[in-house]
């Protein structure tokens, strides 16, 4: 790996390890642009982790000939599809920042319970070895989104919770074909939901702070 690229990833890792800033004497400890920047970095990291975990699980447990048919079954249905949230960048651009933050928070909170079982399911893989930290990473992103909501809502009452149903727990019985399919579907939804969250945050950041990285 090139020295410049390695230094960049080390900087990103260092930023991800930093806690969210606290307010001191009524003044924000970090500008809004930095709050958005940190949230985007954390969402990107989680989305990449979810994508890597999904690919590794698929490679390890799902025969290549079965993957296409499984993708088109109810196994791949995600609870997040039942809420009126944008499904892509173009739709997200039609929503307000406050709406996108609410949707992001709902998506993150729907996974806080299920991901606590990831480390019990995936114990013998280098990719899955970080799964016991996914919960902490999600909680950290949740805190960042809530900080942004406090900054942007400015006393406006919050909308009611839309997503009433959360996801099932991951099944630890990997010898069962049904359990494998269930986990495969959950990982697919986890990847999709984190991709949505990352997209929402990037759309908000780009339209508030015009930058070259807006083309994504």
Curated annotation (Swiss-Prot):
Plays an important role in growth control. Its major role in stimulating body growth is to stimulate the liver and other tissues to secrete IGF1. It stimulates both the differentiation and proliferation of myoblasts. It also stimulates amino acid uptake and protein synthesis in muscle and other tissues. GO terms for molecular function: growth factor activity; growth hormone receptor binding; hormone activity; metal ion binding. The modification Phosphoserine is found at residue 131. It comes from the Eukaryota. It is found in: Secreted. Disulfide bonds join 78-189, 206-214. It comes from Cavia porcellus (Guinea pig). Residues 1-26 form the signal peptide. InterPro entries: 4_helix_cytokine-like_core, Somatotropin, Somatotropin/Prolactin, Somatotropin_CS. The gene is GH1. Belongs to the somatotropin/prolactin family. Its main location: secreted. This is Somatotropin. Zn(2+) binds at residues 45, 198. The keyword Signal applies. PROSITE patterns: SOMATOTROPIN_1, SOMATOTROPIN_2. The lineage of its organism: Eukaryota, Metazoa, Chordata, Craniata, Vertebrata. One of its GO terms (cellular component) is extracellular space. It holds the Pfam family Hormone_1. Keywords: Disulfide bond, Hormone, Metal-binding, Phosphoprotein, Secreted, Signal, Zinc. GO terms for biological process: animal organ development; growth hormone receptor signaling pathway; positive regulation of growth; positive regulation of receptor signaling pathway via JAK-STAT; response to nutrient levels.
